[in-house]
Structures are given as C-alpha cells and as structure tokens.
UniProtKB/Swiss-Prot annotation:
Protein family (similarity comment): Belongs to the universal ribosomal protein uS10 family.
SMART domains: Ribosomal_S10
GO biological process: translation
Record organism: Carboxydothermus hydrogenoformans (strain ATCC BAA-161 / DSM 6008 / Z-2901)
Keywords of the record: Ribonucleoprotein, Ribosomal protein
The keyword Glycoprotein is annotated on this UniProt entry: no
Annotated Gene Ontology cellular component terms: ribonucleoprotein complex; ribosome
Name the UniProt record assigns to this protein: Small ribosomal subunit protein uS10
Gene name of this polypeptide: rpsJ
Keyword Ribonucleoprotein tagged: yes
Pfam families, A to Z: Ribosomal_S10
Biological role stated in the UniProt entry: Involved in the binding of tRNA to the ribosomes.
The protein's assembly and partners: Part of the 30S ribosomal subunit.
PANTHER family in alphabetical order: 30S RIBOSOMAL PROTEIN S10 FAMILY MEMBER
Length: 102
C-alpha cells in the first residue's frame, strides 16, 4: 500500500520563532495520531548587501547588511483526516512562511 506523506517547509528570519512553530506543528500531528519525521534543519540562506555610506563620494566608507533565512523541514507520514483538520486550524506567527506539499 502506498503511504501518504505531507511535507511542510518552514522559513523565517528569526530561528526562535521558527523552532516554536515547528514544535507546535509536531506536537499537533503527534497528538492526532500521525507519525512525524523532523523538524530537520536545512542550510541557512545568507544574503550580504554592501552599500556606500556617503551619497556622493568616499568609496572607502561602506556599510554591510546581512539577511539570514532559516529553514526547517517536517514530514508527516500517514496523516489522518483529524490530523489535516488540526493542522489547518493551527495558528502560526506572522513571521513564518509555510509551504505544504502532499
């Protein structure tokens, strides 16, 4: 028999909010009877932006800004209809981007 699997990918700029959201999803899935694999930490995406401090001259004076995107992966194996309903009702913080694949 073919096993059904839900793959949830979480992204956020702050790792603390991301870990709290992942823990909430795992706890909800386990409570409804599904088996869970994860959260698996994926590599952090790091973007570095360098800009001139001065609007006109002084190329030697620059400022650097960094943007980090933290990612986690959660697999829910054999979800029940109760699991899917509970995951749809879960409330996550605004800073967390969630991507779900069946």
């Amino acid at each position: 028999m073919n096993k059904q699997k839900i793959r949830i990918k979480l992204k956020a700029f702050e790792h603390t909010i991301l870990d709290q959201s992942a823990a909430k999803i795992v706890e909800t899935a386990k409570r409804t009877g599904a088996s869970v694999s994860g959260p698996i930490p994926l590599p952090t995406e790091r973007s570095l932006y360098t800009v001139l401090r001065s609007p006109h001259i002084d190329k030697d004076s620059r400022e650097q800004f960094e943007l980090k995107v933290h990612k986690r992966l959660i697999d829910i194996i054999d979800p029940t209809p109760k699991t899917i309903d509970a995951l749809m009702r879960i409330d996550l913080p605004a800073g967390v981007d969630i991507e779900i694949k069946l």
